């Protein structure tokens, strides 16, 4: 009887741990917004190249987005942020990773299907 109770307790603990990991897995839009806020002026057409702080944020975000869930969450957040910023030039936005020396596993575009990002 005690053995069955101990087994159930272990199973409950494992399920709880998996749920905690799953909820923390994806990058938040707050993280994406914070990392990329230094890029807004450039994305609106100001400057010939992204500022150093912008590239630092892009690199930090690329390093944090390792799992498929992270990449898909970042993709969705990028699209949401792009629609909320007035005067944004998507041509400049799509070129930011390359200008910062960062490889991104999906095109930065409003037409990107974030569910297909891996």
Curated annotation (Swiss-Prot):
Signal peptide range in chain numbering: 1-25
Domain of life of the organism encoding this protein: Eukaryota
A GO biological process held by the record: lipid transport
Family designation: Belongs to the plant LTP family.
Keyword annotations of the record: Disulfide bond, Lipid-binding, Signal, Transport
GO MF terms, alphabetically ordered: lipid binding
The keyword Disulfide bond belongs to this UniProt entry's keyword annotation: yes
Keyword Hydrolase part of the UniProt annotation: no
UniProt-listed PROSITE patterns: PLANT_LTP
UniProt source species: Hordeum vulgare (Barley)
Pfam short name (any one): Tryp_alpha_amyl
Protein's UniProt name: Non-specific lipid-transfer protein 3
Disulfide cross-links: 29-77, 39-54, 55-100, 75-114
Physiological role: Plant non-specific lipid-transfer proteins transfer phospholipids as well as galactolipids across membranes. May play a role in wax or cutin deposition in the cell walls of expanding epidermal cells and certain secretory tissues.
């Amino acid at each position: 009887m005690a053995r069955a109770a101990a087994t159930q307790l272990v199973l409950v603990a494992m399920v709880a741990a998996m749920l905690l990991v799953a909820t923390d897995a994806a990058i938040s839009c707050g993280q994406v917004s914070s990392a990329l806020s230094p890029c807004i002026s450039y994305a609106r057409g100001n400057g010939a190249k992204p500022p150093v702080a912008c590239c630092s944020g892009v690199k930090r975000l690329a390093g944090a987005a390792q799992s498929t869930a992270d990449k898909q969450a970042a993709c969705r957040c990028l699209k949401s942020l792009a629609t909320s910023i007035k005067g944004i030039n998507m041509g400049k936005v799509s070129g930011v990773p390359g200008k910062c020396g960062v490889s991104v596993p999906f095109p930065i575009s409003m037409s990107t299907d974030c569910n297909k990002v891996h």
